[in-house]
Design a protein with these regions (language model features):
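Structural motif corresponding to the C-terminal cap of alpha-helices
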Residues: 66, 71, 143-147, 189
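Short coil/loop linkers at secondary-structure junctions
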Residues: 68, 99, 174, 199-201
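Short Lys/Arg-enriched helix C-cap and helix-to-coil transition segments
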Residues: 189-211
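Short, intrinsically disordered, charge-balanced linker/junction segments flanking boundaries
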Residues: 221-223
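Short, charged/polar connector segments at secondary-structure boundaries
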Residues: 1-106, 112-125
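Amphipathic, charge-rich alpha-helical segments that serve as recognition/docking helices
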Residues: 91-186, 206, 211-218
Length: 223
């Protein structure tokens, strides 16, 4: 079999076992090492990078073994890169004194980046109520924008209902619970910190802290 025939066969086999979307993503993604100075944080990133015991342990691991899982970044028009997933790994690498961080570079739209950022961080073992609140809000808004762009003939309520249901299906929380979390984004920072701190002290107090906080979210700041 000639080289051209073999290449054609491989292309055909690849087409059978992968989708067009997967092939397109593969073409626009690659891995390289980047310095921390080249990577900006995701704007309004809802997940806190805390200097806690978990971070100390992660930094020690990175110092000993390196960064085992690459971060995900997207290229920006000015030639820099924006972190999508891997803020804690980047910070751990800095604490460990590493000059660069392995990164997957992928072309993503603003809404695609938001959805990937939220989905990747929801896998954490410990997530604060405030983090979930703003993460769910950001992802829901991104999903609604995508729905409006892809289904312009639908009534306005259509994409909204579908987005709420889809978000719940992609998350560990119900539609009702997600709505409760999003209500927390209306709280003043001091009250939101109180909710977070109560959960940090005792994880089992989530529902106990969430109920009054949601009720307070309906009050105006003056009230």
């Amino acid at each position: 079999m000639g080289k051209r025939s073999a290449a054609g066969l491989l292309t055909s086999v690849d087409s059978i076992f992968t989708t067009q979307e997967e092939r397109d993503n593969a073409k626009r993604s690659y891995v390289t090492d980047l310095s921390a100075a080249e990577i900006s944080d995701f704007p309004n990133h809802p997940f806190k990078v805390r200097m806690d015991q978990s971070m100390v342990e992660l930094a020690d691991s990175v110092k000993q073994y390196g960064v085992l899982v690459p971060s995900l970044v997207r290229p920006m028009p000015d030639g820099s890169y924006q972190m999508v997933s891997g803020h804690r790994r980047k910070r751990a690498a800095e604490l460990a004194g590493l000059p660069t961080v392995p990164c997957i570079i992928r072309e993503l739209t603003d809404d695609e980046a938001i959805i990937v950022m939220v989905d990747s961080n929801l896998q954490r073992e410990q997530i604060l109520p405030s983090e979930k609140a703003f993460a769910y809000k950001m992802k829901l808004e991104a999903m609604k924008r995508q729905g409006m762009r892809t289904d312009l003939t639908s009534a306005p309520v259509g994409p909204k209902l579908r987005s709420n249901k889809e978000l719940s299906e992609q998350s560990p929380d119900s539609v009702t619970q997600i709505k409760r979390y999003i209500r927390l984004t209306n709280l003043i920072p001091e009250l939101l910190d109180m909710v977070d701190n109560s959960v940090l002290k005792e994880a089992g107090k989530l529902q106990m802290a969430l109920r009054p906080a949601v009720e307070l979210s309906y009050l105006s700041e003056a009230e």
